[in-house]
Structure formats: C-alpha cells, structure tokens
Amino acid sequence: MIYIIDHQDSFTWNLVHQFSKFDEVYCSNYFEINQKKLDQSNTIVLSPGPGSPRDYPQTSKIYNKYKGKKKLIGICLGYQLILFNEKGKIIQQKNIYHGYQSIVRVTKESKLFKKDKNFKVGRYHSLKLLEPFKSNNIKISMRCAKTGIPMGIEDLKNNVYGFQFHPESFLTENGKTIIKKILSA
C-alpha cells in the first residue's frame, strides 16, 4: 500500500490517481495521520503543498522515523522536506516557476534513469535547494538543463527519492513512467 501525506495541495489528488495505477493508495491530511495505515504501507509519498518545509514538523517526524525502513518519495514540497531534514538549506529562488515547463537532464549520479537523458517537466515552485549540498547518501539525480537547479534526488541506501517538479502534471513528459520506475526501485 502507498500512503500519501497530503499537505493541502490541489495536486495531491492527481498524485493519488497516478499512484493508484500501481498499488492501493491511502491518503490523509498531514495533521490527521492514520498510524495503523502508515505502519501497513510499504511506500510513503510526501505531497506538494504551500509554504516551507519548516511549516510541517509532523511530516519531518514521519520522514525521520521511516527513513531506511520504507520507501519515501517527495514531490515538490515533499522533496524540499527530505532535503531540509538532511540539513539542506531551502531558499527563495530568484525566479518563481508556477506552471512552467522546463527541460531537466539526468545526471551521472542517477542509478535509476538514463544518464544525460533530457525530458520536459512541469514546475510549480518558488523555493529551491541552496548549493553546495553535502550528503553521504543523497545524490542529485536530475538538474534543470537551463539553470542547473537540482530537480531530482536518489538515496538508494535508504530508499528515498524526490522530485522538485511534478511527475503527475500534464506538463511532464512520461510522468507515469517516472512514477513506475521509482516504485519499482
């Protein structure tokens, strides 16, 4: 079962629809966690949402409790939450990307996606990871081809993955394939 933690974002139900193509999905609001269902899940998805990662201490506790024990996937805010909990600094970026399509390039650090492959993604964010970012396990797996901003992460040791972009967006090429690849990792 996939447990999606909803950070009160309209894209969450698009994620529910996409992930339900691969497994049973349970979704609840971040402040109404069903602990029994969370424990039963094999994958936890941290959804997009408004604000900053520091606005969601409940989700940070869940991330830290289940990291290395269950597959964790972060989308947009969820991606930022993962990096924030790994001592990454999340900052306001110069340009805001809400409803923009950009090209991302897969980095040589990616073990799941074909190195140097480019594809279009849908972006809806005003925050980004400040670099340099140091981690023993988390690798930057994708970057914006134009700006170099990190757009994807992989931590194979702890089974943690994330995307700054929205794989469920109509602006993202092959979003279903991206989700399938992460779920089968």
Sequence positions of predicted segments:
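Short, charged N-terminal beta->alpha structural module
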Residues: I2-K21
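Active-site environment of divalent metal-dependent phosphoester hydrolases
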Residues: F11, L127-L130, S169-L171
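A short, well-structured beta->alpha microelement
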Residues: S20-K36
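Acyltransferase
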Residues: P167-A185
